[in-house]
Amino acid sequence: MPLDATTQLVTLLGHPVEHSLSPRIHNTAFRAQDVNAAYVATPVRPEALGDAVAGLRALQFLGANVTTPHKEAVLPVLDEVTERARAVGAVNTIVRDGGRLHGDNTDIAGFLRPLEERGGDALEGAPMLVFGAGGAARAVVYGLLSHYRPERLTIVARRPDQAEGLAADLAAHDPDGALRVSSFEEAALSVRTSRLVVNATPLGMAPDRRGQTPWPNPVDFTADHVVYDLVYTPEETRLLREAAAEGATPIGGLDMLVEQAAAAYRQWTDRGMPQAAVYDALRAD
């Protein structure tokens, strides 16, 4: 659909944004459904974030996505924030409703949906483990605590203080006392005895970290494991390849990427995203 005077705009606020796949995802969806909207990525330095958000309101943008380094800093400049976004302390989606801007975090739903589609109910109450303690891990840990009530949820990080901070921040959402913290050096038993293992670190991401893995001991995986890597480039990481060779069920990060985008797309357009067209576009290269 050609752009015209009624085209609605959506943008990505971040710095840098050149690597983002979000414009490809959403513009593919808009075209597939003849939605008169366009998605652009906008580099915004931290000191300009307030002005950028004010611009969304003044220019009547349909909404926006928010990425590094603004996911936390954007909360106080929005009119309303969902409970889940406030719980994890991060917003990745903004929706304009009249003159008000609402913030949400669709990373949580985006992470959970691929698990649910692969029989995730069997993970209810199971022991789990997450590699990483950054922003991605925060959404993952909150989602697992709220949806699966794991018997044990171990956060494995190279910086124990960061993992301890994450556990403390989410303690209010851990009524069963499931959260544990471990170093990589002490995590072997937790890896072996967890039903779900999630990589929420950049290890394995192309180009700079391709071939790296958070867990170089694949013999610790079995057919009882579900191994979920949030890395989406390449689509099959070393972690997933090695875990699958041991019989584990692999889930790649491309599914989460599309699902979190679909959750935002629905809020902006009140439509389901045409995911088959989006996957085709992402895999075209």
From Swiss-Prot:
GO terms for biological process: amino acid biosynthetic process; aromatic amino acid family biosynthetic process; chorismate biosynthetic process; shikimate metabolic process. It is an enzyme of class 1 (oxidoreductase). CDD domains: NAD_bind_Shikimate_DH. Keywords: Amino-acid biosynthesis, Aromatic amino acid biosynthesis, NADP, Oxidoreductase. Pathway: Metabolic intermediate biosynthesis; chorismate biosynthesis; chorismate from D-erythrose 4-phosphate and phosphoenolpyruvate: step 4/7. GO terms for molecular function: NADP binding; shikimate 3-dehydrogenase (NADP+) activity. NADP(+) binds at E83, G132, A133, G134, G135, A136, L230, G253. Its EC number is 1.1.1.25. It catalyses: shikimate + NADP(+) = 3-dehydroshikimate + NADPH + H(+). One of its GO terms (cellular component) is cytosol. HAMAP family: Shikimate_DH_AroE. Homodimer. Involved in the biosynthesis of the chorismate, which leads to the biosynthesis of aromatic amino acids. Catalyzes the reversible NADPH linked reduction of 3-dehydroshikimate (DHSA) to yield shikimate (SA). This is Shikimate dehydrogenase (NADP(+)). It comes from Salinibacter ruber (strain DSM 13855 / M31).
